[in-house]
Amino acid sequence: MSGNRPIKFRILELFLDGKEYWNYEIVSKIQEEYNMNSAYGRDSINFDIIELASGGMLKDVEQKVDEAGIYKKDFLLHKYVITDFGKARGSDACLRYV
């Protein structure tokens, strides 16, 4: 559970299992935990994921167009995995020792 942990820390924590996740899977989990159920909340969380990827903590491993409207119809979906750098930063933030 998230508690009062900053959202980006929680996102990293979800990825620490080493599995690949689509952005919409992480977004929906964070929306539920932080009660951010608006379109603004959804897009804000997605932007946090993009920032973590641009900072080298997550790696974009697959993309596809959201034809079914799972996240936002006709938008690009991304699948991410945590990097070694992300694991180290997560450990530094005391999320979990890896």
Show which residues each predicted segment covers.
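Short, leucine-enriched amphipathic alpha-helices that occur as contiguous helical runs
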Residues: N4-L12
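Phospho-regulated, low-complexity intrinsically disordered regions of nuclear gene-regulatory
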Residues: S44, G55, V61-V98
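Residue-level marker of regulatory loop/turn positions in helix-turn-helix DNA-binding domains and
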Residues: G3-N4, F75
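Alpha-helix C-caps/helix-loop-beta hinges
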Residues: G18, G55-G56
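Short, positively charged loop/turn segments that connect secondary-structure elements
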Residues: Q31-F47
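Short capping segments at the starts of secondary-structure elements
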Residues: L16-E25
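Alpha-helical residues within the helix-turn-helix
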Residues: S28, S54
